[in-house]
Structures are given as structure tokens and as C-alpha cells.
Amino acid sequence: MKTIVLKLGGEIVHSPELDLVARDLRTLVDGWNRVAIVHGGGPQATALQKRLGLETRMVAGRRFTDEATLEVMKYVVAGRLNVDLCGRLLANGVMPVGLHGASGHAIQATRRPPRVMQGAGPEPVDLGLVGDVVGFNLPLLGDLFERRYVPVLACLGCDDAGQALNINGDTVASQLAGALRADALVLVTSTPGVLRDVKDPSSRIPRITRAEFERLVADGTISGGMIPKLEESFEVLRGGARSVVILGKLAPGDLEAAVLEPGSAGTVLVGE
């Protein structure tokens, strides 16, 4: 039995790839594997803000969240996307349970204090109603796993006073993987894994250790935005997860293979 945390971007919720994910999830859950899903909704939130005439303000790649933006996030992430995602999973034989921070305090958070952020100047930045994860309701998730339900967590946390807080979906997924001591955190992306040649999908690197990552950066194989993404993934391993899988451009069976046969699909990152 394995414990898997799956991170889905908002863009996949209404894509054909979701049905491939759902079918593999059913196979994994039928095999008594424990699966939790974390999803975001950034593109849909930005689109709704534009329709409503609201400014989308980004600071160092993070969304500034005022009261109006938080209302949009509630509607989009905890509302429409969570319901639509659960519906698609249900249609494929998976039994999902939609959750957010206020659902049994599933995602426990505190408001992030102002802090200096890389790329945002020397002064501390206040991101508004943005939260930092301080814990999860692990007994609740454990009960759902025992009954072969799949928790589907929208990336909204909640503090002890009941205030909803916007949290980056990758952050929620990474910290949940650590808290569960997950066998794998699977990041579904737009690429089939880490590539030696970004123009050649067949140049996928099946497995990377920390030492190999440093060598690939030094020789220029890994460059640009992939460097911080992989740095963050190796931090997840230090936080308690056993592996991180980068997976995309899915074919039938890819998710199942990536979890049960590490390296057979996507790229698996391991600590050593």
C-alpha cells in the first residue's frame, strides 16, 4: 500500500487528461493505495477577476489577495472547480470527498506576516489574505483513506477564527506530502518530465538524485525555470516525502506506472 499526493493545476480540471488521471486513480484506490488530491485554480480565478473588472495583482509570482480576490477564490477554487473535479472523478468510478480549509479544518493555516520576497525589493511585502500551512486534520484524512475515499482539497486554508486564507496549491501539496510521509508527490504538468532536450519529448530523464541534479545544472542540461522547480521538489523530500514525480502529456496508464514502477513514466526525484 502506498500513500500518494497528486497535485493538479486548475488547467487540467476541464481537460481530457483528467479522465486518464481518474481511471488510473481508480486502479490505485482499488489496490488499497491511499490517494489525496490537491488542486489550484489560478487561470480560472484570473479569468473571473477580468470578467468582474477586478485587478489581478501579482507580487513576485504570488497573487495579492484582498477581500474581493478571496471571494473569487472561494467561488472558483472551493466552489466550481472542486465540484467539477469531484464530478469527473465520480463519473470514472472514484469516490471523491471535496474539502477546503474550513471542512473539518482540513487545512490549518495562519495569515502570512509581511516578509521580504525575492524579486520584490528590499521592503517586507504584505500579500493580504494569504496563509501559511501550519497543519492538516490527519485523522479526518485517515478515516477517508480507510474507506477508500479520495480527499480532494482546494487550496484554501482556514485559521482558528474561521478566516479563509488563500494558499499556493503547490505549497499545500508539498506540505501535505510531508505530513503524510507520502511515498510520492505527483506533480501533473505540461511536460512529460525533465528532458535533456526541451524540444525532444523522447529525451526524458527517468530518475534524478540530488547529486545528479547538481551535475545536470552544472553542465547546462537543466536550466532556467526548471532549476527552482526542482530545488523546491528536493525540499519536499527533506520534508518527509519519499519521492517526487513530475508527469505530464499523459497517456493511458502513465499515472499508475509512475507510482507503482518509479521512472517508467515522467521523472522521479529521490533523495539519494
Curated annotation (Swiss-Prot):
EC number: 2.7.2.8
Function (record text): Catalyzes the ATP-dependent phosphorylation of N-acetyl-L-glutamate.
Catalytic activity annotation: N-acetyl-L-glutamate + ATP = N-acetyl-L-glutamyl 5-phosphate + ADP
SUPFAM superfamilies, per the entry: Carbamate kinase-like
Main location class: cytoplasm
Record-annotated site: Transition state stabilizer: 7, 229
Protein name (Swiss-Prot/TrEMBL): Acetylglutamate kinase
Binding site for substrate: 41-42, 63, 166
Family, similarity comment: Belongs to the acetylglutamate kinase family. ArgB subfamily.
Molecular function, one GO term: ATP binding
Annotated keywords: Amino-acid biosynthesis, Arginine biosynthesis, ATP-binding, Cytoplasm, Kinase, Nucleotide-binding, Transferase
GO BP terms in the entry: arginine biosynthetic process via ornithine; L-arginine biosynthetic process
UniProt cross-references to InterPro entries, sorted A to Z: AceGlu_kinase-like_sf (IPR036393), AcgluKinase_fam (IPR004662), ArgB (IPR037528), Asp/Glu/Uridylate_kinase (IPR001048)
GO CC terms: cytoplasm
Disulfide bonds: none
Compartment(s) where it occurs, according to its Swiss-Prot or TrEMBL record: Cytoplasm
Pathway(s) of this molecule: Amino-acid biosynthesis; L-arginine biosynthesis; N(2)-acetyl-L-ornithine from L-glutamate: step 2/4
NCBIfam families the record matches: argB
